[in-house]
Amino acid sequence: FYTNGTWSQGMTALMALRYLQKTDLGSLGHNSAAYVHRVTQALELAFADRDGYLADPAFVKVPVQTLLSEEYARNRRSEFRDEAFGALPPPGEIEGYAPFNAGATAGGTEQAISTEQAISTLYGACAPRKTAAAAKPRFDGTSLPSVRGRLAAALDEMVVGQDTSQLVIVDREGNMVAITPSDFPKSPMVPGTGMTLGNRMVQFRLDESSPNVIAPGKRPRVTPHALAVHRDGEPWLIFNTPGGDMQAQALLQVFLNLSSFEMELQEAVNAPRFRTVSVPSSFAPHEAEPGTLWLEGELFGETAQALSARGYELVEYQPWDNHFGSVGAIIIEMDDSGERLLLAAADPREHTWAAGR
């Protein structure tokens, strides 16, 4: 497995997979209550470790090898239980570290600032000061009311995307690339430059006990990431998705659909998903809904009843809802003649396409 560094949440799915390694998931039944419960608890333990340990490695010493070790995973597996955790459990203990307990501080005292407030503040700070020399009229679109009015009308009618973008590419030589670019709607633009400001600093923490606490020159631990999987030493699968804290959850579920239930790639992507929101959001003010699971509609039946009996609060969503990610994936297979075959899948939860030539 390959993923982004600890300045992202890329390790989260790998840690959860490690915690699940000794569980025969296939025998539990796909998307059964027992399966959803076990995968959810593995994810919640991994998210606790994400928030406890992961951050920009230029500023924080991250115990990567320990977090991915079998010994550490064995200790984390001992936390599995029959009923829902409720609040996010604490991170695991590693000698020499004092990890941040995100579950104990969800929401905390950290305050969010609205996008509109941020834009107003930034525009005020970035607006050029008018001097006699700078007051010379120039064409910037604002001097043409009719053009400006038409632009405003067009923007009012535009459906603005609310999510990260994703792109997965494999060429004829088998080279694999996945990119997950992301800035949110209404990213502030510096007047006169055409350049938008990044706004991922909302994924920093203000709590000084967090490894992801804001600092000059430091990268926030961001949610966008991708996963690449090799099989028998050769590239096999590459995939990513938008979705914030759902990203690791969606990628893990798709991979388990392939590995534990032997689904075809598009089937694995289409299959109903679930989402824990016990995890404090990566976005300020880092709110959480302890013990709450979101389920796509097809899971809202016997599975939901059994999960409720385990102590989960459940929220139903329509099938193929974009709150559950939008995975793009490519698998490299070899046919009987040794020719490389590329199998691509696009998630119906967003405007996602798969194409080849």
Each model region followed by its residue ranges:
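Catalytic phosphate/nucleotide-handling subdomain of diverse soluble enzymes
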Residues: 1-46, 190, 196, 227
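Short, well-ordered beta-strand elements
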Residues: 1-5, 12-16, 25, 167-169, ...
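Second-shell loop/turn segments in exported
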Residues: 1-6, 28-31, 155-156, 238-242, ...
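Internal maturation/activation junctions in enzymes
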Residues: 25-182, 192-193
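Extended C-terminal subregions enriched in glycine
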Residues: 47, 173, 218, 251, ...
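Active-site rim segments in enzyme catalytic domains, especially the processed small/beta chain
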Residues: 139-160, 165-237, 247-248, 253, ...
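In a subset of proteins, long, contiguous C-terminal domains/tails are tracked
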Residues: 301-357
